């Protein structure tokens, strides 16, 4: 993983996030809160473990993992998922599986920004973060 991912990132733009949350099955009240949130993402590494902490007024979440090893994750919308993060062509690709469903989250560095694509049932959400 490139050390360029490491650091603190602030959301600057978001497209189709409400549609993505609908595809995940998130209820209206939580979607409204999610749409208002402007999260900060902190990515750090200690040894073989990568930690991604997401902080917002809505909720804070944190995952720690080794690349290529499945782990249990409780998502911001309280889904209990089995997740795995791999390095794919310079991007961090995360796959969450729960209740027979699956979503993919791809984090890519582009022009000094972190572009996060979230894909579920044909819905593609793009969220762009700038380093703080």
Curated annotation (Swiss-Prot):
Assigned keywords, A-Z: Acetylation, Cytoplasm, Lipid-binding, Transport
Give a yes or no for keyword GTP-binding in this entry: no
User: PTM N-acetylserine: at which residues?
Assistant: 2
Localization recorded for this chain is: Cytoplasm
The UniProt record gives the binding positions of (9Z)-octadecenoate as: 107, 127-129
InterPro entries this protein is in?
Calycin, Fatty_acid-bd, ILBP, Lipocln_cytosolic_FA-bd_dom, Myelin_P2
What are the GO MF terms of this UniProt record? Answer: cholesterol binding; fatty acid binding
Q: Does the keyword Cytoplasm apply?
A: yes
UniProt record similarity statement: Belongs to the calycin superfamily. Fatty-acid binding protein (FABP) family.
The domain-related comment in the record is:
Forms a beta-barrel structure that accommodates hydrophobic ligands in its interior.
Question: What role is this protein assigned?
Answer: May play a role in lipid transport protein in Schwann cells. May bind cholesterol.
Q: What else is known?
A: P2 protein and myelin basic protein together constitute a major fraction of peripheral nervous system myelin protein.
Q: How does it assemble?
A: Monomer.
What the entry lists under PANTHER family is as follows:
FATTY ACID BINDING PROTEIN
- Can you name this protein? Myelin P2 protein
The record lists the lineage as: Eukaryota, Metazoa, Chordata, Craniata, Vertebrata
> Gene name on record?
Pmp2
């Amino acid at each position: 993983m490139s050390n360029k991912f490491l650091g603190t990132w602030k959301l600057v733009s978001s497209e189709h996030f409400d549609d993505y949350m609908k595809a995940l099955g998130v209820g209206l009240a939580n979607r409204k809160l999610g749409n208002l949130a402007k999260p900060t993402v902190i990515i750090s590494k200690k040894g073989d473990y990568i930690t991604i902490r997401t902080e917002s007024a809505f909720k804070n979440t944190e995952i720690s993992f080794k690349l290529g090893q499945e782990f249990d994750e409780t998502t911001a919308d309280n889904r209990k998922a089995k997740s795995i993060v791999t390095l794919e062509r310079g991007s961090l690709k995360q796959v969450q599986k729960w209740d027979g469903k699956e979503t993919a989250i791809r984090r890519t560095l582009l022009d000094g920004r972190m572009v996060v694509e979230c894909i579920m049932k044909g819905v593609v959400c793009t969220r762009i973060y700038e380093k703080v």
